[in-house]
């Protein structure tokens, strides 16, 4: 057995990140919603995340406290420089994982699977997955071979 085994919670504490998984979801969505206009509003954020506006308000206030957004009650939500950088990285992480799952031929809800994975993956593992996905994108013949392999195993592609 590998030395230094920890519970999931302890592994996540080691990352020394102030953002919870929920905060990451909110920050990623704020980034998505504000790419064109440089801001978003609580009602748009709440609708995009399928939460109630008071819940979105509480979370945005917490995020303002740690400096990733600027927000005044009933006003606009504007990402700070730090928030914009993190939001961009979170969206990139999401897209890499989603592309990876699609490449594998995951059936069902790729979005749901992506959400489950993205908050627990290390940056090193994400980098390796990004390289893997890029390698296969550059070799469509291998993707096709993989799809054939999956079909011969009786698995859907």
What is the predicted role of each segment?
Residues 1-19, 157:
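N-terminal leader segment of winged-helix/HTH proteins
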Residues 13-51:
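N-terminal helix-turn-helix DNA-binding core of bacterial DNA-binding proteins
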Residues 42-77, 81:
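Canonical helix-turn-helix DNA-binding module
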Residues 75-94:
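Basic, amphipathic "hinge/linker" alpha-helix immediately C-terminal to the N-terminal HTH DNA-binding motif
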Residues 93-101, 125, 136:
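Alpha-helical linker/hinge and terminal dimerization helices associated
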């Amino acid at each position: 057995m590998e030395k230094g085994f920890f519970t999931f919670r302890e592994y996540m504490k080691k990352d020394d990140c102030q953002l919870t998984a929920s905060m990451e979801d909110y920050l990623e969505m704020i980034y998505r919603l504000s790419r064109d206009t440089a801001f978003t509003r609580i009602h748009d954020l709440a609708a995009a995340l399928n939460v109630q506006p008071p819940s979105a308000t509480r979370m945005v206030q917490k995020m303002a406290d740690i400096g990733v957004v600027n927000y005044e009650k009933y006003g606009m939500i504007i990402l700070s420089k730090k928030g914009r950088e993190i939001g961009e990285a979170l969206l990139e992480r999401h897209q890499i994982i989603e592309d990876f799952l699609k490449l594998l031929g995951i059936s069902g809800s790729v979005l749901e699977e992506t959400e489950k994975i993205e908050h627990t993956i290390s940056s090193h593992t994400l980098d390796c997955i990004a390289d893997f996905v890029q390698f296969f994108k550059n070799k469509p013949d291998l993707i096709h071979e993989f799809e054939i392999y999956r079909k011969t195993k009786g698995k859907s592609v």
